[in-house]
Amino acid sequence: MATVTASSNFVSRTSLFNNHGASSCSDVAQITLKGQSLTHCGLRSFNMVDNLQRRSQAKPVSAKSSKRSSKVKTAGKIVCEKGMSVIFIGAEVGPWSKTGGLGDVLGGLPPALAARGHRVMTICPRYDQYKDAWDTCVVVQIKVGDKVENVRFFHCYKRGVDRVFVDHPIFLAKVVGKTGSKIYGPITGVDYNDNQLRFSLLCQAALEAPQVLNLNSSKYFSGPYGEDVVFVANDWHTALLPCYLKSMYQSRGVYMNAKVVFCIHNIAYQGRFAFDDYSLLNLPISFKSSFDFMDGYEKPVKGRKINWMKAAILEAHRVLTVSPYYAQELISGVDRGVELHKYLRMKTVSGIINGMDVQEWNPSTDKYIDIKYDITTVTDAKPLIKEALQAAVGLPVDRDVPVIGFIGRLEEQKGSDILVEAISKFMGLNVQMVILGTGKKKMEAQILELEEKFPGKAVGVAKFNVPLAHMITAGADFIIVPSRFEPCGLIQLHAMRYGTVPIVASTGGLVDTVKDGYTGFHIGRFNVKCEVVDPDDVIATAKAVTRAVAVYGTSAMQEMVKNCMDQDFSWKGPARLWEKVLLSLNVAGSEAGTEGEEIAPLAKENVATP
């Protein structure tokens, strides 16, 4: 367990702290710690009664208090008699830090659970100087490797969720500018050498936060979260959390009723390290067997290793993943289970499809497109946006030519290498291709060569470009997602919301979200071996594109567009399913929530530095 310093008696209450002119924590330190409650510059100090009641303070405010505050207008009706206390821990949280689906989930799912009346926190590293997160002045001491480190917490309250950021130089010093490509390593495909220490620190800090942060931003909940909580650990970076919970806390009578759900967003990244590195984790020898792992690869070392994700699968109380079909794939065998299939078969693995940000991705309000539209005006609007897209990327402007878009990371998982080889087989059709993505330098070079190989027919843009991503999503007729494996996928969800028909590989969440012939076209199942491009996959991709283009301009295409736009991919449905799973863990005080809108008025957008 960590040691809390004296400054932890003061914690962030609201973002009004900095607005009141306090420039540093030194002002707070001048307050005398008396046995009485006091408020200063948005901070609240613990008094003696607080310390005796910290566990009970994690519960919702009383009905009497709720009645007093009922005069305040909220965005929707919420009844919060008793809700769960849910804490999400991850290496990313959108929009502050995001490389893909993980950041989107931690950005979107927590507000949806909060909207159902639960108390929700997210905990993520503070990679940058986020201008909307304030220093709580809470400092804890955590042992990382053979050193004791001081760790601070920053906080902001958005859309009913306590957003907590773990502050330490091990996170902040490594990231300069955009966090997108530097969260895990200096360049794509290269990890930081001290990632074990970085994420060990994150897991331990996450277990301290519910007890030491006395957060009062919500008028529905007050005080520390306490011990009756559900931790949701996401991917290998947080895999140590169930181990630390058991060894450092429950062994000492703390968090006795807490539970851990481990959510797999991408099983390809498991946290495999040298076997001798186990000593860096400061865990008892009794957990070593959960980490013990053998594979046939030479990275990071040949032979025996430790595997963080394996340990989380075995030690967590429940295992989830991000789509039902992906859950089936994970237990199907060594290839798609990436050598963890036999351990997953020992557990109950459930899949819940992800939602999407229906505010950012909304064709009727999208700030990046000049013409707004909905399901009733899509037929008239899309050709005009297509012409703007063609002009923007330098293709001949012709609304009658079908445009196929690709948006994603340029790497083997996303199948960009398969697509590049397939393009030559369907470029004879009356079609244009736009590829937007960044990633491996070799693959970036491949897409940049398309314009020379197929002038007036194909173009590649190897840049991070949000406005262009929105324009492609709205202006293209088809979006292609040729992934070798895809746990859930968001590109196809965005596309369908904009009436852009997806052409997808038959894997993971793509199977769950795209119905062949109704809301899109399926290519088939790809070979998951990434070392080479399977010629059969190239042929299947070209055939699927040919089939889609044949439907273009027909009444069947118009019907498919409307079917796509008629789907509901908001977080409301997934939140109900998540709630059901979390309630099944029977943490004390947990009761079902109430359907409603955001507890706090919805911010126009989360503010995060680039």
UniProtKB/Swiss-Prot annotation:
Residues 1-79 form a transit peptide. Keywords: Chloroplast, Coiled coil, Glycosyltransferase, Plastid, Starch biosynthesis, Transferase, Transit peptide. Gene3D superfamilies: Glycogen Phosphorylase B (3.40.50.2000). The keyword Kinase does not apply. It comes from the Eukaryota. One of its GO terms (biological process) is starch biosynthetic process. It is an enzyme of class 2 (transferase). It holds the Pfam family Glyco_transf_5. Pathway: Glycan biosynthesis; starch biosynthesis. Residues 438-454 form a coiled coil. It is found in: Plastid, Chloroplast. The keyword Plastid applies. ADP-alpha-D-glucose binds at residue 98. One of its GO terms (cellular component) is chloroplast. GO terms for molecular function: alpha-1,4-glucan glucosyltransferase (UDP-glucose donor) activity. Its EC number is 2.4.1.242. Induction: Circadian-regulation. Strong up-regulation at the end of the night and the beginning of the light period. Expressed in roots, inflorescences, flowers, fruits and at much higher levels in leaves. InterPro entries: Glyco_trans_1, GS/SS, Starch_synth_cat_dom. Belongs to the glycosyltransferase 1 family. Bacterial/plant glycogen synthase subfamily. NCBIfam families: glgA. Required for the synthesis of amylose. Destroyed as it is released from the starch granules during the night. The circadian expression is controlled by CCA1 and LHY transcription factors. This is Granule-bound starch synthase 1, chloroplastic/amyloplastic. It comes from Arabidopsis thaliana (Mouse-ear cress).
